[in-house]
Every structure is written in structure tokens, then in C-alpha cells.
């Protein structure tokens, strides 16, 4: 790979244009973009003369849908890394991917992955009805437990020496130690979708599983023979251990298709007539209710604009609408409305009821959700 394609002015400027989308409101980004010719030229000069020094990323924690540590990279470093990722790392690493690796790639994503699983279930039904089994895997702490030696070795095998050294420099600066990454950068996402590529080929080409799908570390196999799937499970676990990963024993199991499959936030149900129904998973509903209650409480205290809470709910609602969720959405709309009314009533209550006689703030609904599919 020609260095000019990674650290040349045109490559860096194009990368800057991509990186600024959606974050131009940030002061640091706005400053860089407003002074783009000078800033990009300076970055190019530093990279070509070997004087480039990346800055320290900022680490923070998100709690929804689950608790994770995230790294935020300074904008100028993101510009360089985006060019490195887009022009070298992504095209080289994804070249060997199987079709049914669905995360973080152009033309793929969660919606298409869900459609693909529906297609698999319909295909299975045409040959076997509902008399089949699923082997589903859960890796314990996928990113936090990634072995640095394994990831670096994986990149070394496929990249030219110069490109590999650039990737290695970034990894060593941002992620010291020998284990664990924060999934806040594109480079680590590429590592995430690449880490199990060897396993994908093993499952498809040696175990001969045709109905296999993976989204990052969430993957499953469908087959009519339970005993065969159980044998596959043990072989796959040994492969994962060889990569440095551990599985969650309780969640990694073989079970009947009739039990339903939870995948990417939805429960997939194959009916006796061959229809595939999607319901928002109970865990997802429960987590969103808890999240909304917390956001509404913060908004009532003046810590968060109501528009931000509305946007969060609208985003979840759009996600839920992709399933058979009419009744669930009706009930969630009522629940969301009740959260705002509940707070207002609580304030009125505090104003009119003498101290010591008021009741606590009671949840409008308890539990994992009473919508469809639960």
C-alpha cells in the first residue's frame, strides 16, 4: 500500500469529511474543520516526518443497553485512523469474510441480519417443520477479554509490514497491556468483526453448517440433529478457547427451535404454520423501562432536556416497530406518558399534602414488560 493513499493530503482530507459528520457541533471538531487546509497539512507533515504524536483518548462508561467502557479519540487522531482503517485495514480484513458475518460492514447491519435469520427459519421449516434445534453461543466479555497477542497476530498475517506497523502503533498507544479493548474506535470494531473469521470458516467449511449467522460475538447454528449440534458446540468452544475467549456456560446452549430464539434484541418465533414472528425480547423491554424512568427523573430535575428523552424513546420505538409489536407499542406509549404525569402528580402531591403523610413514587408498571412476545 502506497503511503500517499493513507497519509497523503487528499486521503486525510477525505477522512476528515467523513469524521465530521454528526459531530460538527463539538468545539474541537469545529475548530479543526474551519481550519481544515492548515490542520490537515500539519497532520500530513507530522505523519510523513515521523513527528506525529497521538493524544490520549477520553474514557467513559455507558449503561444502556448494558454497562460498557468506551474510548473517545481526539478528532485529529480519528482523522488519521479513519484513513488508515478505510484505505487499508477494512478492505484487507473483510476480504476473507463469509457472507453471514453481519456486523459493521457496508450494506449489512442489524436489520439485514434479522431478515437473514427469518430467511433461515423459513428455509428450515420447508425441509423439517419445527422439529429442529439451535446452538447459541455467548462469549464472556468479548472486547474486555480480547487477547492483544491474538489480535496483533491476526493483523500481522494479512497486512503489509508498513501498514501493520501503523496499526500496531495505534493499538499500543491507546490500549496498553496484553488484554482487553474498549469498542470506541473503528479500528477496534474491525478487530471485533475479524477476530472470529477463522471460526466462521471452520463452522461453514469443516462442520458443514449451512444455517449459521454471526453478528459480532452473537452467533448461532440451526440443525435438525440435536446430538450433532451438541458435538459442534464442544468443538466450537475449544476453538474459542484457542483464541483466548471464554464462553458463558449457562447462556451457551442447545435448545429446540420451538422455544424461540433471542437475537439482536428480538425473540424469533417459528410457528407451526411456518410463519416467523418477531417480538421485542423481555430483557430489552425491561431495560428500556428502567432507562426511561431514569431519564425522565433527570429531565424533571432540569439535568436533561425533555426533547432528548423524547428522542431516546422515539429511537427505541422505531427499533421495536420492526417486530410484531403493535400491542407492546401501545402499552409502552401509555407507560412513557404515565412517567411524565406521575412526576407532575408527585409534585402536586408534595404541595398539598402535609409533611409525613405523603406516599412514595410508585412505578406505573413493574416487570419485564407486558407487550407482545413476553
Regions found by a protein language model. Name each.
Residues 1-41, 347-374:
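Non-catalytic, polymerase-adjacent accessory regions of viral genome-replication enzymes
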Residues 19-30, 60-71, 98-100:
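Glycine-/proline-rich flexible loop or hinge segments
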Residues 39, 46, 118-216, 220-239, ...:
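Conserved polymerase palm-domain catalytic core
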Residues 45-66, 79, 160-174:
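Reverse-transcriptase-like RNA-dependent polymerase core
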Residues 67-98, 177-205:
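Conserved pre-motif C helix in the palm subdomain of viral-like polymerases
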Residues 73-74, 82, 137, 170-177, ...:
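Right-hand nucleic-acid polymerase module
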Residues 85-144:
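Active-site-proximal segment of RNA-dependent polymerases
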Amino acid at each position: 500500500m502506497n503511503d500517499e493513499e493513507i497519509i497523503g493530503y487528499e486521503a486525510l482530507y477525505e477522512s476528515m469529511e467523513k469524521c465530521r459528520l454528526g459531530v460538527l457541533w463539538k468545539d474541537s471538531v469545529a475548530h479543526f474543520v474551519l481550519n481544515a487546509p492548515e490542520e490537515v497539512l500539519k497532520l500530513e507533515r507530522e505523519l510523513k516526518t515521523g513527528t506525529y504524536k497521538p493524544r490520549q483518548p477520553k474514557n467513559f462508561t455507558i449503561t444502556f443497553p448494558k454497562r460498557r467502557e468506551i474510548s473517545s479519540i481526539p478528532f485529529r487522531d480519528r482523522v488519521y485512523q479513519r484513513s488508515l482503517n478505510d484505505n487499508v485495514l477494512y478492505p484487507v480484513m473483510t476480504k476473507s469474510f463469509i457472507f453471514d458475518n453481519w456486523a459493521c460492514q457496508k450494506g449489512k447491519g442489524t436489520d439485514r441480519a434479522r431478515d437473514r435469520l427469518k430467511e433461515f427459519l423459513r428455509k428450515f421449516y420447508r425441509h423439517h417443520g419445527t422439529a429442529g434445534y439451535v446452538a447459541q453461543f455467548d462469549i464472556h466479555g468479548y472486547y474486555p477479554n480480547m487477547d492483544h497477542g491474538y489480535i496483533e497476530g491476526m493483523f500481522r498475517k494479512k497486512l503489509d509490514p508498513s501498514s501493520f506497523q501503523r496499526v500496531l502503533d495505534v493499538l499500543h498507544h491507546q490500549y496498553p497491556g496484553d488484554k482487553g479493548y474498549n469498542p470506541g474506535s473503528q479500528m477496534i470494531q474491525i478487530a471485533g468483526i475479524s477476530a472470529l473469521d477463522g471460526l466462521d470458516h471452520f463452522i461453514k467449511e469443516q462442520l458443514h453448517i449451512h444455517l449459521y449467522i454471526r453478528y459480532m460475538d452473537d452467533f448461532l447454528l440451526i440443525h435438525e440433529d440435536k446430538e450433532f449440534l451438541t458435538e459442534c458446540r464442544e468443538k466450537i468452544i475449544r476453538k474459542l478457547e484457542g483464541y483466548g475467549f471464554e464462553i458463558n456456560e449457562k447462556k451457551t446452549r442447545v435448545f429446540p427451535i420451538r422455544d424461540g430464539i433471542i437475537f439482536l434484541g428480538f425473540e424469533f418465533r417459528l410457528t407451526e404454520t411456518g410463519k416467523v414472528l418477531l417480538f421485542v425480547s423481555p430483557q430489552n423491554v425491561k431495560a428500556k423501562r428502567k432507562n426511561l424512568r431514569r431519564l425522565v427523573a433527570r429531565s424533571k430535575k432540569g439535568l436533561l432536556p425533555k426533547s432528548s428523552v423524547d428522542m431516546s424513546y422515539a429511537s427505541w420505538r422505531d427499533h421495536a416497530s420492526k417486530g410484531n409489536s403493535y400491542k407492546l407499542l401501545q402499552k409502552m406509549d401509555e407507560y412513557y406518558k404515565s412517567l411524565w404525569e406521575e412526576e407532575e402528580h408527585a409534585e402536586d402531591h408534595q404541595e398539598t399534602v402535609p409533611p409525613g403523610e405523603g406516599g412514595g413514587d410508585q412505578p406505573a408498571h413493574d416487570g419485564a414488560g407486558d407487550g407482545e412476545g413476553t
